[in-house]
């Protein structure tokens, strides 16, 4: 009976290894107003490692001292860049670091989806939980309570683990966030 089921599964399903994503970096504090094309052209012209690289702009966002840009690139360019401390752009030396593109829901605080696609029945309508203290009824920016991570608390209850919970759900000290980063790294193409 089991062999028949296995045969049926083989005929109806295909097993595929997920494709790996290109590594991303975030370049900090770009003060010049650049079009996407000017940005890429300047990176290529002033960074020998990027001359022939496959570069793709993911997004940019305002920061305290300009704009931060997130770009993806092929593993060869990424591995060459990570040996450096700075990247050149418009005759400035700017700092950068790897960016993991962590997706976290601002309703339930879980990873892998956004608030818009949250399936948690508890948060379908109305607001979610505070990412700082895990309580309902207010947002993180309004919170003055002691931090308590909803993800580590849930993991401890579900699996009997003893993760510390005295941090926000967005903290770099969060063990669940570390696991999410490890998962992203496992799906990234860093080359052979």
Model-identified regions with their sequence ranges:
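Solvent-exposed, positively charged interaction surfaces of folded domains
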Residues: 1-192
């Amino acid at each position: 009976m089991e062999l028949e089921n296995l045969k049926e599964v083989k005929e109806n399903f295909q097993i595929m290894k997920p494709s790996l994503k290109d590594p991303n970096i975030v370049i900090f504090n770009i003060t010049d107003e650049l079009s996407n094309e000017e940005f890429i052209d300047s990176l290529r012209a002033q960074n020998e490692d990027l001359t022939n690289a496959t570069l793709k702009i993911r997004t940019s966002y305002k920061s305290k001292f300009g704009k931060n840009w997130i770009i993806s690139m092929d593993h060869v360019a990424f591995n060459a860049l990570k040996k450096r401390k700075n990247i050149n752009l418009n005759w400035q030396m700017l700092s950068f670091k790897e960016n993991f593109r962590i997706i976290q829901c601002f309703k339930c605080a879980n990873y892998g989806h956004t608030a818009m696609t949250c399936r948690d029945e508890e948060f379908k309508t109305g607001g979610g939980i505070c990412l700082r203290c895990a309580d309902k009824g207010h947002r993180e920016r309004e919170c003055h309570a002691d931090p308590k991570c909803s993800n580590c608390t849930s993991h401890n209850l579900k699996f009997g683990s003893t993760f510390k919970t005295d941090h926000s759900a967005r903290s770099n000290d969060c063990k669940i966030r570390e696991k999410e980063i490890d998962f992203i790294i496992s799906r990234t193409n860093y080359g052979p």
